[in-house]
Amino acid sequence: MTCCEGWTSCNGFSLLVLLLLGVTLNAIPLILNFVDEDQFFENPISCFEWWFPGIIGAGVMAIPATTMSLAARKRACCNNKTGMFLSSLLNAITVIGAAYCLLVSIQALAEGPLICNSQSNTTSSCEFSLKNLTANYKESFDLQWFFEDSCVPHTDSNNPSITNTTANNWRVYNLHFNSIENQHRIIHFSVFLGLLLVGILEILFGLSQIIIGFFGCLCGGVSNGRSQIV
């Protein structure tokens, strides 16, 4: 195994781990939503897990490059110019998918879960458009929704239905509401921070494989020439 093939094989194992991690992280809020509500699309944690950044972006789009890179271990297809060049092209798809995962994760961390932004916790309030990925980047990026005691907008204190509520009932309701709110905030933050890191690492591994693939084309030519002389 040449140095190029060795690095390609290492890249393949790294992409495989990141691929599985991305799919798992993306599936966590979907599974929890189904377990809690016994059906999808009702009271989701956020809109962004339904963009499937980990399942499609960091997962499906990384499968071809991962398979090709792992084949280098057995010298099945990455031991020649064509194989290394094809590996570079497939990793370009991985970089695109990882960039998609990265953009969705940044947007998700900027906006927070639905419980912090919407009165109706349903996917009916979600706008699935690629324009949304860049629409709010001009705004300041912060994580106040996560670090504050509560991210839920305060209700109007002049509302008679609230002023007539007893203090004891309000405290019980507030504690119960915050427990659900904190659960959504922690899951949302953990999932998309993890997907953000997965996207960054996949981009780095993908770009490194693109570069090493072009070097592999040169190494493959030299290796073939030496084998013919021997």
UniProtKB/Swiss-Prot annotation:
<keyword id="KW-0812">Transmembrane</keyword>
<dbReference type="Pfam" id="PF05805">
    <property type="entry name" value="L6_membrane"/>
</dbReference>
<feature type="topological domain" description="Cytoplasmic">
    <location>
        <begin position="105"/>
        <end position="185"/>
    </location>
</feature>
<feature type="topological domain" description="Lumenal">
    <location>
        <begin position="1"/>
        <end position="11"/>
    </location>
</feature>
<feature type="topological domain" description="Lumenal">
    <location>
        <begin position="66"/>
        <end position="83"/>
    </location>
</feature>
<feature type="transmembrane region" description="Helical">
    <location>
        <begin position="84"/>
        <end position="104"/>
    </location>
</feature>
<feature type="transmembrane region" description="Helical">
    <location>
        <begin position="45"/>
        <end position="65"/>
    </location>
</feature>
<dbReference type="GO" id="GO:0045861">
    <property type="term" value="P:negative regulation of proteolysis"/>
</dbReference>
<feature type="transmembrane region" description="Helical">
    <location>
        <begin position="186"/>
        <end position="206"/>
    </location>
</feature>
<keyword id="KW-0256">Endoplasmic reticulum</keyword>
<feature type="topological domain" description="Cytoplasmic">
    <location>
        <begin position="33"/>
        <end position="44"/>
    </location>
</feature>
<protein>
    <recommendedName>
        <fullName>Transmembrane 4 L6 family member 20</fullName>
    </recommendedName>
</protein>
<dbReference type="GO" id="GO:0005789">
    <property type="term" value="C:endoplasmic reticulum membrane"/>
</dbReference>
<feature type="site" description="Cleavage">
    <location>
        <begin position="13"/>
        <end position="14"/>
    </location>
</feature>
<feature type="topological domain" description="Lumenal">
    <location>
        <begin position="207"/>
        <end position="230"/>
    </location>
</feature>
<dbReference type="GO" id="GO:0016020">
    <property type="term" value="C:membrane"/>
</dbReference>
<comment type="function">
    <text>Polytopic transmembrane protein. Inhibits regulated intramembrane proteolysis (RIP) of CREB3L1, inhibiting its activation and the induction of collagen synthesis. In response to ceramide, which alters TM4SF20 membrane topology, stimulates RIP activation of CREB3L1. Ceramide reverses the direction through which transmembrane helices are translocated into the endoplasmic reticulum membrane during translation of TM4SF20, this mechanism is called 'regulated alternative translocation' (RAT) and regulates the function of the transmembrane protein.</text>
</comment>
<keyword id="KW-1133">Transmembrane helix</keyword>
<dbReference type="InterPro" id="IPR008661">
    <property type="entry name" value="L6_membrane"/>
</dbReference>
<feature type="transmembrane region" description="Helical">
    <location>
        <begin position="12"/>
        <end position="32"/>
    </location>
</feature>
<comment type="similarity">
    <text>Belongs to the L6 tetraspanin family.</text>
</comment>
<keyword id="KW-0472">Membrane</keyword>
